[in-house]
């Protein structure tokens, strides 16, 4: 074999090795990109699709597009936020604005002397902030946006008063809890820590959001406001190892007669559900 043939064989062998190496690099990069996308950037559109490794360990980021009750809402998952392309490469839904005054419940303004005196007293003592009137007057700037690929979220550790469903009457402070939650969350971005999936295929979660006071645990805030009680179920209760906090703030709200604890006779959501099932 001549020197020229040997050189050609060497070049062909080197070229083949380079092609194989390049193919492996491209394949590896592609597989790595797919794995990274699935793990960090793939949108979750229902609770049953949440990967097992996320429960109790990782957080989901997204926008609240609908609040249907005092202890649950719908989350439009936006993994990676702006770095995941949301808002410039991937579309984020815009919620329709509510009516000009933003009030959910219309209340007649009465000139009753006693009512005016009572409200003045509540405002003077600071208890007005936890009264039914205060919560009903909260403004909600957006309307719910339905029919989206969203994850239904159930707030962990709490039960809010039941609203009117299937012909059943609403509990006191059911509307107040709904309005407060809409005022606090609707149209905003939140962090959600998945804990479990309940019988209705909702993701029971710890939910936090940012405001000028810092990060706030929404479930805990509802207990502090007197708009929810600590979850009464013996099974499937999720506290994310913070049950003592919820119990402490429930006792405090009860002692200070905040929200639903202002009533003379209390019927908890758990007691109400048992009653209507009979």
Swiss-Prot record:
One of its GO terms (cellular component) is mitochondrion. The active site is at residues 154, 162, 202. Pfam families: SNase (PF00565). One of its GO terms (molecular function) is metal ion binding. PROSITE patterns: TNASE_3. Ca(2+) binds at residue 159. It comes from the Eukaryota. Keywords: Calcium, Endonuclease, Hydrolase, Membrane, Metal-binding, Mitochondrion, Nuclease, Transmembrane, Transmembrane helix. Its EC number is 3.1.-.-. The chain crosses the membrane at residues 15-37. It is a single-pass membrane protein. SUPFAM superfamilies: Staphylococcal nuclease (SSF50199). It is found in: Mitochondrion; Membrane. Its main location: mitochondrion. Residues 58-263 form the TNase-like domain. Belongs to the LCL3 family. This is Probable endonuclease LCL3. It comes from Vanderwaltozyma polyspora (strain ATCC 22028 / DSM 70294 / BCRC 21397 / CBS 2163 / NBRC 10782 / NRRL Y-8283 / UCD 57-17). The gene is LCL3.
